[in-house]
UniProtKB/Swiss-Prot annotation:
Residues 6-149 form the Nudix hydrolase domain. Gene3D superfamilies: Nucleoside Triphosphate Pyrophosphohydrolase. The gene is rppH. It comes from Neisseria meningitidis serogroup C (strain 053442). The keyword Transmembrane helix does not apply. This is RNA pyrophosphohydrolase.
Length: 174
């Protein structure tokens, strides 16, 4: 299901622990890492889609998390044409996402990457809050930065800024 501009409605999930570290998932049989995300089905609310994706990708149930907040508006990224399925070229541009910030209220052992028959991730770790911006595939970087900035400024008081984090990193990591 695409909107008029060719974007697929989607939710992104930033799951944090008590140290404000983020869940960082390794995609199955790939060397790429990302936040959990997934499409919104017709008739499904963003919040319902978020809980479905949280279970499908991370194996967590609503009782394992607390919603801290969400982005006010859709954040969009374009997918490079060589990443788009041939049959979608010309109509599909990318994803538009509502991002949720969740706090894990359960335990690390509640995470179950094999909760469904088609796992998205085959590994995971807790990661510094801002580190994913520099590690995610390039075409998603602006959306990751926008979501992390908006959610930290609105809901995580005292969080180090991305600019301060980036200034502390070795120059080869930016």
């Amino acid at each position: 299901m695409l909107d008029r501009e060719g974007y697929r409605p989607n939710v992104g999930i930033i799951l944090i622990n008590e140290r404000n570290e983020v869940f960082w998932g390794k995609r199955v049989r790939e060397h790429s890492w990302q936040f959990p995300q997934g499409g919104i089905k017709p008739g499904e609310s963003p919040e319902t889609a978020m809980y479905r994706e949280l279970y499908e990708e991370v194996g967590l149930l609503p009782q394992h998390v607390k919603i801290v907040g969400r982005t006010r508006d859709w954040l969009r990224y374009d997918v490079p044409n060589n990443w788009v399925r041939r049959e979608w070229r010309g109509s599909y541009r990318g994803q538009k996402q509502i991002w949720y910030l969740l706090r894990l209220t359960g335990r690390d052992c509640d995470v179950n990457l094999r909760a469904t028959r088609h796992p998205e991730f085959d590994g995971w770790r807790w990661h510094q809050y801002w580190a994913p911006v520099d590690e995610v595939i390039e075409f998603k970087r602006d959306v990751y930065l926008g979501a992390l900035k908006e959610l930290s400024s609105r809901f995580l008081r005292g969080m180090e800024s991305y600019e301060d984090f980036a200034a502390r990193q070795p120059s080869g990591n930016r």
